[in-house]
């Protein structure tokens, strides 16, 4: 499916970036996640049964915004949901389609921009993003789009990097994981361009998230700050030390309801 209009710069850059890094970094984790039935969250794989971030999805229409290899879509489909996945990058979707064939579990996958999804208003009961649109799309564009796609009473659940992690992680991977001191300002958080990566990330402070959600007709239900479990030995890509993540939240899940 082609994009209806020229892509914003950050969307085009992130599309090219993810097309490049999918195979070496994310295809194998995607295969492992597809092979599991249990839903887990984040870099330490904390079980959904512990966090209770999701509503009952059986019989619900669900959209995953920034689905990547679509393992979250697969988990939700196995739970009885009617799922549609959207991703800006074609390479992760190729992996997703191959895994759909392997596991004989197929959901619609759209190659498109999560900030401008080519689907009708009020089509879904739940919108989910697990490090997809939630950090790779501009929240001032994708949150209004999620609101448009959801029916009244529908829920939005999305996972992002913890605010403290964003403030304490060094500029480059070579400098190591998150530190125990602040490295950048909290106020004015929005667009992040790391020196060693060509992509563009987006992170907001707590107040900005709350105001943005409310401005788009959402009631904030919960903010789940994920703590690394005692048995955690390491996370994906060494972004954070487990001991750090046992003291401060490296990840957080927002839950909101469309009013």
List each language-model region with its residue ranges.
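Conserved alpha-helix/loop element of class I SAM-dependent methyltransferases that forms part
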Residues: 31-60
């Amino acid at each position: 499916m082609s994009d209806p209009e020229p892509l914003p710069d950050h969307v085009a850059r992130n599309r090219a970036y993810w097309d490049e890094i999918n195979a070496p970094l994310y295809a194998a984790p995607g295969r492992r996640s597809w092979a599991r039935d249990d839903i887990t969250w984040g870099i330490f794989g904390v079980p959904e049964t512990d966090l209770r971030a999701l509503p009952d999805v059986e019989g619900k229409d669900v959209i995953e915004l920034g689905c990547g290899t679509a393992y979250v879509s697969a988990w939700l489909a196995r739970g009885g949901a009617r799922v549609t996945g959207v991703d800006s990058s074609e390479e992760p979707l190729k992996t997703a389609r191959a895994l759909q064939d392997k596991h004989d579990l197929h959901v619609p996958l759209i190659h498109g921009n999560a900030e401008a999804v080519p689907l009708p208003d009020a089509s879904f009961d739940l919108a989910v993003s697990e490090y997809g649109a939630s950090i790779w799309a501009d929240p001032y564009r994708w949150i209004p789009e999620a609101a448009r796609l959801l029916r009244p009473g529908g829920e939005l659940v999305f996972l992002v990097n913890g605010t403290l992690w964003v403030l304490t992680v060094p500029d480059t991977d070579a400098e190591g994981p998150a530190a125990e001191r602040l490295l950048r300002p909290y106020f004015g958080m929005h667009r992040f361009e790391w020196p060693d990566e060509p992509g563009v990330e987006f992170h907001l402070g707590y107040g900005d998230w709350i105001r943005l959600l409310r401005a788009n007709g959402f009631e904030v239900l919960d903010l789940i700050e994920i703590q690394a479990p005692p048995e955690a030995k390491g996370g994906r890509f060494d972004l954070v030390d487990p001991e750090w993540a046992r003291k401060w939240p490296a990840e957080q899940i927002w839950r909101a309801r469309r009013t």
